[in-house]
Amino acid sequence: MKNYNLSDNINRSNILTEESNHLSKNIDTVSTSKLVDIFVEEDKKPQQAISQAKHQITKSIDLIYQRLIDNGRLFYIGAGTSGRIAVLDAVECPPTFCTSPELVQAVIAGGSSSLINSSEEKEDSNSLSIKDLKERNFSSKDCLIGITAGGTTPYVLSGLNYARNIGALNIAITSVPEQQASFGSNITIRLITGPEIIAGSTRLKAGTATKMALNIISSGVMIKLGKVFDNKMIDVSISNKKLFDRALRITSSLLNIEMKEAQLLLDQAKGSIKVACIIKSSGMDQKSAFALLERNNHNLRKALKDINIEF
């Protein structure tokens, strides 16, 4: 334990995520079945919190989308569990949507080592987050989502302040009400899940709600960017056998063709489902199909409409 001084302590007992949950009082004395019942009941609250924050989540998707089509990027920033949840979402974007690793990035206090080793003390730094963002050339064109369940994390708060000061879109995600934490951000998404089953352990309900929110935000933005057609991930990066199979099935399904023809088309299209669909639907060659996509911001539906093909 480091030498902390009581005189420097901030009493967080009034913060919602630090309060004691009366439903889990004496949880260490109940049966395993009762323990699980408590978790099952309490884990309904993240979904309710997401529903209540629908307006803010919707607005976030629209504003982030506008930034990204203007060559901006999306950053998440967090410490501890919040940072790890951010990484979970960001690293899935390249394989799912074939994005550059630069487009959606997670910045976690303590860096990559914090993914497997706790470095909670890093969250107390007011300067480290600014340094981390500057190292990634974070600019006014970009977006920053700062995640702090209790609303007090210096690493995240200073990052949000920096984003605001340089004119970047800044969005806060927290699990406490406004009277307990006010951020001055463009948008604040308040996921009010209440006191945790284990008091203060925000990896539980607050963490679950945060992951749900990030799922919706990143997926929503990618859908608007044309990374999904119908409900299929047509920009999937074919990087393993499972994803090769998925690409085959998507191509086969969209074009109503056999798997063998789907593979031939994907080979011709250099692995791009979008290009394969244009080649098959229009008779274009690979180069012309790709050029058509580029003219339509890589949006397959718009590209097909551009050549009067209804899909």
UniProtKB/Swiss-Prot annotation:
Domain of life from the UniProt record: Bacteria
Pfam family membership, one: GKRP_SIS_N
Enzyme active site: E92, E123
Reactions catalysed, as given in the entry: N-acetyl-D-muramate 6-phosphate + H2O = N-acetyl-D-glucosamine 6-phosphate + (R)-lactate
CDD domains the UniProt entry points to: SIS_Etherase (cd05007)
Residue ranges constituting the SIS domain according to the UniProt record: 64-227
Keywords, alphabetical: Carbohydrate metabolism, Lyase
SUPFAM superfamilies referenced in this protein's UniProt entry, alphabetically: SIS domain
Pathway assignment: Amino-sugar metabolism; N-acetylmuramate degradation
E.C. no: 4.2.1.126
GO MF terms held by the record: carbohydrate derivative binding; carbon-oxygen lyase activity; ether hydrolase activity
Class of enzymatic activity (EC top level): lyase
GO BP annotations listed: amino sugar catabolic process; N-acetylmuramic acid catabolic process; peptidoglycan turnover
NCBIfam families: N-acetylmuramic acid 6-phosphate etherase, PRK05441.1, PRK12570.1
Family in the record: Belongs to the GCKR-like family. MurNAc-6-P etherase subfamily.
Miscellaneous field: A lyase-type mechanism (elimination/hydration) is suggested for the cleavage of the lactyl ether bond of MurNAc 6-phosphate, with the formation of an alpha,beta-unsaturated aldehyde intermediate with (E)-stereochemistry, followed by the syn addition of water to give product.
Subunit structure: Homodimer.
HAMAP family: MurQ
Biological role stated in the UniProt entry: Specifically catalyzes the cleavage of the D-lactyl ether substituent of MurNAc 6-phosphate, producing GlcNAc 6-phosphate and D-lactate.
Protein name (record): N-acetylmuramic acid 6-phosphate etherase
Species the sequence originates in: Prochlorococcus marinus (strain SARG / CCMP1375 / SS120)
Gene name linked to the record: murQ
